[in-house]
Amino acid sequence: MNTLDWTQLTADARTQALTRPVQTVATQTREAVATLIADVRARGDVALREITARFDGVTLESFAVSDAEFAAADAAIAPELRQAMQDAVARIDTFHRAGMSEGYAVETAPGVVCEKIVRPIGRVGLYVPAGSAPLPSTALMLGVPARLAGCREVVLCTPPRKDGSVDPAVLVAAQLTGVRRVFKLGGAQAIAAMAYGTDSIPSCDKLFGPGNSFVTEAKQQVAQSGAAAIDMPAGPSEVLVIADAGAQPAFVAADLLSQAEHGPDSQVLLLSDSDALITAVQEQLDLQLAQLSRADIARQALAQSRLIKVATLQDAFEISNRYAPEHLILALREPRAWLAQVEAAGSVFLGDYTPEALGDYCSGTNHVLPTSGAARAYSGVSVASFQNMVSVQAASKAGIDGIGACAVILARAEGLDAHANAVALRMGVAA
């Protein structure tokens, strides 16, 4: 990892230090994704089979996972893995259920009641990536809130393996959350299929899930076309750690590596006011990296990541808010005291004993989070992500008589005579 002193960097160098790797390739992928989406729209399942053969190395007769495949997956996974997923589902359910909105009603004036009612989105599409490793945890993170929201239909796409099967843990995770419509389809082509629909894949109202730069670009393109809404830009994983001199170097290094092993386009950043801590973390990175099964992938990610020395911890928070990380770890002696300084982050992890990996799997919070700086304006997935909040209002005759003049005056100011007349007629006065 590159080690930098923030106080010695120019404005341009500071911008470069916080530039994410994916941002440099977005323009290269945009045209390729647009071509692929157009092909799926035009040729449907035929295009999907050709694209799947090209990218996944398998020709599929059917994209849908059969009951027999679900049963085989159920028999294939280890009992301890099943139990771990069941435990995770319970905690994810507990956390997300506590945050559910029940709507509300308020009388804004005598005889005028305004409400918000909550309705589930009808059909949602979940994407569970498996590019460098299958991610059954993502199926849990998306399936639980979709179930709690009460969505009428939930569709899940995940890439096939070269033998035409799907990772059994992903299928069991889907079953544990009540999802049975699973399709063997990955990448931008899966996003296109769920957005526009084909003979095999139903079109969905909203799409969810993380992915590589191609998946993220595909989600943004289908959203811009109006074909389907999306949860957020959720691209390559990233973590930013703010650590003080009292942090455990081994813990910090382990947290950095846990993100670096996701993929070569992941980014990890460490901000610290301690030279000694930064040096010790670098040593730990070298030691721990040698023990990882995905060391080559992690090494590529580390090559474009940063260890940054800051003058003060306050400076670190200013940098973090500018970067708006997906994951923010506060390896500090009084982490909760610093929490008020956080303005933009997907998920925050407080203290030495809250590794980001807990949030990835089983603490209960959601791990589908905004990346690439989107945490400035987006939140992570929740039950509300799968729901619509519908406004309702009801006015009695006394109610419209009481507030109608306000509407008439505002309508006239905007030159909208019909608006004014619609109110005035009910009041029994001339507009």
Swiss-Prot record:
Cofactors (names): Zn(2+)
Domain of life of the native organism: Bacteria
Binding sites annotated in the UniProt record for substrate: 237, 259, 262, 327, 360, 414, 419
SUPFAM superfamilies: ALDH-like (SSF53720)
Active site: 326-327
Gene Ontology CC terms, in alphabetical order: cytoplasm; cytosol
EC number: 1.1.1.23
One biological process term in Gene Ontology: L-histidine biosynthetic process
Pathway(s) annotated for this protein in UniProt: Amino-acid biosynthesis; L-histidine biosynthesis; L-histidine from 5-phospho-alpha-D-ribose 1-diphosphate: step 9/9
CDD domains according to UniProt: Histidinol_dh
Cofactor annotation remark: Binds 1 zinc ion per subunit.
InterPro entries per record: Ald_DH/histidinol_DH, Histidinol_DH_CS, Histidinol_DH_monofunct, Hstdl_DH
GO MF term set: histidinol dehydrogenase activity; NAD binding; zinc ion binding
Protein purpose: Catalyzes the sequential NAD-dependent oxidations of L-histidinol to L-histidinaldehyde and then to L-histidine.
Similarity remark: Belongs to the histidinol dehydrogenase family.
Name listed for the protein in its UniProt record: Histidinol dehydrogenase
Record gene name: hisD
